[in-house]
Amino acid sequence: SACSHRLSLGADAYDRHVAMLTERFVVSPGPTSPAADYYRDHDRLRGWIVTLVITVIAAVTRFAMLRYPTDAGTPVFDEKHYAPQGWQVLTGGGVEDNPGYGLVVHPPVGKQLIAVGEALFGYNGWGWRFSSALAGTLLVLIVVRIVRRLARSTLVGAIAGILLIVDGVTFVSSRIGMLDIFLAFFVTAALGCLVVDRDEMRRRYATVRSEGRMAASRFGPRM
């Protein structure tokens, strides 16, 4: 037993033996202070450079020849619903002409965003697809930033962005005047806000702990 081993070695020798084993096998704790500003700022700059490069690549793939194809100058597939409705929102004082409310299930935001592109470029392929292409490009940007923050790796974030660029569903959704890409963009942006909030609360918690205010109130520390 530990007691008999302690008696056979002697108290002092046994304690030195335990201390030696502890130093050998216990993993050293992490740093108690943040990294130097130089390395933090350098990584932040590199992260934004990589993000912007990948975003530019995404923009090229989303905007190149955006007006093609069309059905003899008219919308294709379900664009035939949303492009005219966006135009109605633009030309009808923000009101969509929807007799019988056949498509009332769709919220107006997506059609309003399509209308923005039509206001800039007219009723053509560029007009009804511009907002989708912009949302698809920004989707790549926020995915790179979210994954980089979660993985704490610029490389992993870059890989996520590249995979999203070449994803077929996202590529097509970004180049057609429909509502799917707007839903994907806003849901992903909401996730990004949650991740940022998580990191902010961790930072506040670390500050409270370092200042010794954990037990300042029976309801917990004020963050």
Predicted regions and their residues:
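Short linear segments in intrinsically disordered or otherwise low-structure-confidence regions
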Residues: 6-8
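Short hydrophobic alpha-helical segments enriched in small aliphatic residues
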Residues: 13-15
